[in-house]
Structures are given as structure tokens and as C-alpha cells.
Amino acid sequence: STNSPYTRYGFGSLADQGFGNSKAMGGIAYGLRNGYQINASNPASYTAVDSLTFLFDAGMTLQNANFKEGNIKTNAKNSSFDYLAMQFRLWKRMGMAVGFLPFSTVGYSLSNTSELTKDEDGTVINKTASYAGDGGLQQVFAGVGFKVLDNLSIGANISYIYGDITHSVTTAFSNSSSFSSVRLDKISINDYKLDFGLQYSYKFNKKHVLNFGAVYSLGHSVNGKGYKYNQKWLNGADYPSTQTGDTIT
């Protein structure tokens, strides 16, 4: 889960696709190659595992964040599941990995109250806008790596991305003669992601090896469904309206 106003935009906070060994080195991943650690960021690294090794890895993140606006301070403690994956030798020159990891997370709740004007009897009218969002996208992946040469490997990951994201805005006024409203936007995503990886190893001696890595992700429009809901009310009377869509690009 998360609690950040920045997740209001786009698909939310994009998850770090790196595993523990990558996070420990500041997020580098494309060149990492280790027979005892999974590197799902570059599928070419899957060939590093030997025939007697089966890897299973899981991780989570704990976060402590402080937000400040003017004199208002807020502390948020979040925990999130990061990944679950396994890797094994598929063939003499081929390795494989499968796993599950988040793609993005959305979670926020904030409000703002402002003074608009005074009505006929001099009463101040306040407007309160409340913003909330939750949800996120998950991804399941499977990938293979193939050792073309002793020092050159290639690989590919295919991922299925799915999930729902909801954003809502509620506007309320302090007087009874003004319309209040709520607007809800929800998107549901079901799509794929395809990544290609390459790794080249240059061996200086028995102890020192320099690894080069590169990854290319196939770009395409995101497919999904959108749902919109709008409602206004005044003195107990509701005036709802809905609208549905088919494609999000």
C-alpha cells in the first residue's frame, strides 16, 4: 500500500522493478549477473544459473515518509509487497524465471477548504474539495535467457499487467443552496509488456569480469476500460449521471 499525493497522476507511483541485489546498489540492474541471485530486469541474466541451482526470492519494502505544506505536516508509514520469483536452468544453455511483482500503486486522501464569498445574510460560504484514490497495477511475468556464446547472452520477458485504479473528487459547500458533487473515474487495465535483454561479459582474469547489459521494451498503446460517474445533490435531491468508455490510450 502507499499514502502519497503524487500517486494522483498517471498510473500512480511506478514500482521499482529491481530485486534486493539491485536495490542494494542504488537500482543498477541491466549489467548484474549472478548465478545465485535473480535479476528480472534483464532476462539475459537467467543463463547465469547452473543446472544444480533452483532460486526462490521474495521481498517487501517498509517506507516512512513526511509531507509538509505550509504549517501542516503529515507522517505516513507504508509497507508493500515487492516481488515473488523463481529461477532455474531450463536447458544446457538456457535459463528461465517466472514471478509476480507490482507495476504501480495508488493511494492518497487529501482535502482543501477555501472561502468563496458571503451569501445574502452575510454568512461565509466555504468550499471543501476532497480528493481520494486507490488501487494499482500488478504484473505476472515469465522469461527465458539463451547463451549464444560463452560471453554473450540474450533473453526476453513477457508480462501480463492487470488491475484497477480509482480516483474521486468530492466538492461540498457550507450553505444549503449550492450544489455539492462527486466525480469518480475508474480505469481497468488488462494488457501485456514485452522486454528484450542482452548481456556481454568481458573477463579480465579469474577474479574480475566486466558485464555490459542492455534492455529494450516494446512500446504500444495501453488497452483497458474506463468508467465515469458524476452525481450532484441539493437539499436531499440527487441528480446522478453516468458514462462508460471502451478504450484508454
Functional labels for PLM-detected ranges:
Residues 31-33, 139-140:
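Short hydrophobic "helix-edge" motifs at membrane interfaces and signal-peptide entry regions
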Residues 1-24, 69, 89-249:
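Outer-membrane beta-barrel porins/channels
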Residues 4-29, 47-64:
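Transmembrane beta-strand segments of Gram-negative outer membrane beta-barrel proteins
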Residues 32-111:
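Outer-membrane beta-barrel translocator/receptor signature
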